[in-house]
């Protein structure tokens, strides 16, 4: 199989990371006579899965073609009908896929259904491809198995471990290229999280802007930990349309209202918001990957 086809499937899946949770992001391409004849990627709920989009987008005879997808096709009726049904009906003869879906409702059953229908399954991928496929769904799997989001911490520090000068007057200790990468990271997470001290000192917007400076709408959620309800209603975090979630404690009310603002009160533990409770709440909201800044 041409590695370019596999690369295209992975690229499609990676494009959707941070945009389709609580679904896992999947990429799919359809090959016939060594030519790519269609492709698709996962849509946010209630849209289609990648495999169905690839089948629907195909304008050529799909019979006896090969489907490459980055995650096992799902095999049960949920928000969407099973992808396995669409694949079987389409006339696709072979499915190439690196990993099983960790969802217990699937977990190999998708492959079994396809095999029973006479469709050949190939899973002969390199360790690098398998690792890449698993990385794409790391948030989905973390949520599924541990019931909490996958969390990454972004921190800028000097070689001796400092993040600013003693006076806190320093603005940047990173290069423009590094800051650009940090902004790009935001687009690959469902939410960016920070504390009230960062809001007060830096007054960030916590958005991802394109090369022209336009807001992209990602990440879809901005989360602030504000134990004492100190956030200013004029903070820049409220300047864009993404949903902002503020976690505060039940004794500290935030009295103002804004569009796309959700205030969630939790119990206080050791004088702060209860992080364990917060992570469970966030996971239940369908937020599977968080970038902490």
Enumerate the language-model features and the residues they cover.
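Acidic-residue sensor for enzyme active/binding pockets
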Residues: 51, 72, 293
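Short cysteine clusters
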Residues: 54, 74, 83
């Amino acid at each position: 199989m041409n590695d370019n086809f596999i690369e295209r499937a992975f690229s499609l899946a990676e494009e959707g990371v941070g945009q389709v949770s609580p679904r896992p992001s999947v990429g799919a391409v359809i090959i016939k006579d060594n030519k790519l004849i269609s492709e698709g990627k996962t849509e946010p709920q209630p849209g289609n899965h990648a495999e169905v989009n690839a089948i629907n987008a195909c304008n050529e005879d799909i019979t006896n073609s090969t489907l490459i997808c980055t995650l096992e096709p799902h095999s049960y009726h949920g928000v969407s009908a099973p992808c396995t049904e669409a694949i079987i009906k389409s006339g696709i003869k072979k499915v190439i896929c690196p990993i099983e879906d960790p969802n217990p409702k699937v977990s190999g059953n998708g492959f079994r259904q396809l095999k029973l229908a006479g469709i050949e399954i190939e899973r002969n991928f390199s360790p690098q491809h398998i690792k890449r496929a698993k990385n794409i769904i790391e948030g989905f799997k973390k949520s599924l198995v541990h019931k909490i989001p996958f969390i990454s911490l972004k921190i800028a520090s000097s070689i001796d471990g400092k993040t600013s000068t003693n006076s806190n007057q320093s603005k940047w200790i990173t290069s423009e290229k590094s800051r650009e990468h940090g902004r790009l990271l935001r687009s690959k997470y469902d939410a960016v999280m920070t504390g009230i001290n960062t809001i007060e000192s830096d007054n960030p917007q916590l958005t991802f802007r394109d090369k022209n400076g336009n807001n992209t709408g990602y990440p879809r959620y901005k989360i602030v930990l504000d134990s004492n309800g100190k956030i200013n209603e004029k903070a820049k975090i409220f300047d864009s349309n993404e949903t902002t979630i503020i976690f505060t404690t039940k004794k500290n009310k935030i009295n103002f209202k804004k569009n796309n603002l959700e205030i969630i009160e939790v119990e206080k533990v050791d004088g702060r918001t209860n992080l364990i409770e917060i992570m469970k709440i966030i996971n239940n909201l369908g937020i599977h990957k968080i970038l902490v800044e």
